[in-house]
Amino acid sequence: TSAFMQAFTHNPTEPVYDDSDPDAGGYSRIKAMEYYNPVAIINERNMESKNDNYGANIRATLNILPIKGLKWENFVSYDKEQYETREYYTHYYPSLIGTNGQAYIENYQENDTQYESTLNYSNIFGKHSIQALLGYTYQYTYSTSASMTNSGFDFDDNQTHYIGTGTNLTEGKASMSSNKEDNTYIGFFGRFMYNYDDKYLLSASLRRDGSSRFGDNN
């Protein structure tokens, strides 16, 4: 529920507070309309999020002697992302009045590993120029997530820190979910280029990719 949209569409002369309605926490509300007090939307919820990202990569090149023009290049990278989201809506959050507070927690983590290796050859023999490339690439991604929503708290002080104390859990009404996903990608590729006297050019390339996302035999 957007506080901005509620403020934009509501009668500006409507009071913000109404002490005669304790169920709404002293906020003004119109029960017959799908209108939610924008001030209550802002004040009666707490949203926290934490996001951490880590990454590292290494690149190395080796000249392979005694073959002139032949190089072996390798690249390795690792990235990790994780975040946690916590949301709490008090007893007086407009669209949830009667649920006695609602808490939500979500955790997500993803790890991504990549490796690429290539052999590069480049040389000139008189009027002849040759360039060749052979490569291999690998990527593995692994992610997990979990979330939980619970309602029915005696008071709002604990927010999301004791999410298991809500009565919806004991009544079998709380929602929980978790997920795990991992994907692997592998690719082989090559390219060959021949140039004669900067007049004639011959080129060829190939590539073969496979991924766990593609299904069997791919």
What are these regions (language model features)?
Residues T1-G55, E73-I186, R213:
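Surface-exposed loop/interface segments of Gram-negative outer-membrane beta-barrel transport/assembly proteins
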Residues N51, L62-K71:
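A conserved hydrophobic secondary-structure block that centers on an alpha-helix together
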Residues I58, G190, Y200:
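Substrate-binding cleft of carbohydrate-active enzyme catalytic domains
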Residues A60-I64, Y121-N123, Y194-Y196, A204:
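Residue-level signature of outer-membrane beta-barrel architecture
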Residues P66-L70, K127-I130, Y200-L202:
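Repeated loop/turn-to-beta-strand initiation elements of outer-membrane beta-barrel proteins
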Residues I186-Y196:
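Structured alpha-helical segments in the cores of large, soluble enzyme domains
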Residues L202-F214:
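Transmembrane beta-strand segments that form the barrel wall of outer-membrane beta-barrel proteins
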Residues D216-N218:
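Short glycine/threonine-rich loop-to-helix capping motif typified by GTGT followed
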